[in-house]
């Protein structure tokens, strides 16, 4: 598939040329659509899910160490990056709160956080298995592996077990 542009006394037009059954097909698309597509794809490329890897991280109001500390989070706290400024990430969390964190405090580790009150963590991936412990909303875990809709998780303190994916973000 090729891309050819045509310059004239009208808005920029793109012609997409493809070959189908030994015949050339030319499709004309206007720059507005292509511009829209580029903006959408650029925004998607920036969006990235990361995890706090430091024992504790300060969440700040802006991209600087002298910005106010809004709150603190613990290890394995998952974030969704919405903007980058230098060495800082602006993010949204599971409660749709936003803040800034320095890139040295995050990594690409797979992690989840409980989104419901009183979530059971079990010995094996089934509701029929023994409950090892129960956690409140907002507790982060590293994901070790998955089996169907179940996640084998580990807390920063070393506690492990299985949790259903409907209970986490």
Language model: regions and residue ranges:
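Compositionally biased, low-complexity intrinsically disordered regions
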Residues: 14, 20-22, 41, 130
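Bacterial N-terminal signal peptides that target proteins for export
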Residues: 22-33
């Amino acid at each position: 598939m090729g891309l050819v542009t045509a310059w004239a006394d009208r808005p920029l037009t793109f012609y997409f040329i493809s070959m189908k059954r030994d015949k050339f097909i030319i499709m004309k698309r206007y720059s507005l659509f292509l511009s829209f597509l580029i903006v959408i794809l650029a925004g998607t490329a920036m969006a990235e899910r990361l995890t706090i890897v430091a024992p504790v991280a300060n969440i700040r109001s802006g991209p600087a160490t002298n910005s106010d500390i809004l709150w603190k989070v613990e290890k394995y706290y998952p974030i969704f990056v919405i903007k980058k400024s230098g060495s800082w990430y602006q993010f949204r969390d599971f409660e749709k709160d936003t803040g800034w964190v320095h890139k040295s405090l995050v990594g690409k580790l797979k992690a989840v956080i409980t989104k419901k009150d009183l979530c059971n963590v079990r010995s094996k991936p089934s509701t029929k298995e023994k409950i090892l412990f129960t956690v409140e909303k907002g507790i982060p875990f590293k994901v070790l592996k998955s089996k169907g809709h179940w996640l084998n998780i580990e807390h920063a303190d070393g506690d492990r077990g299985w949790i259903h994916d409907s209970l986490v973000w």
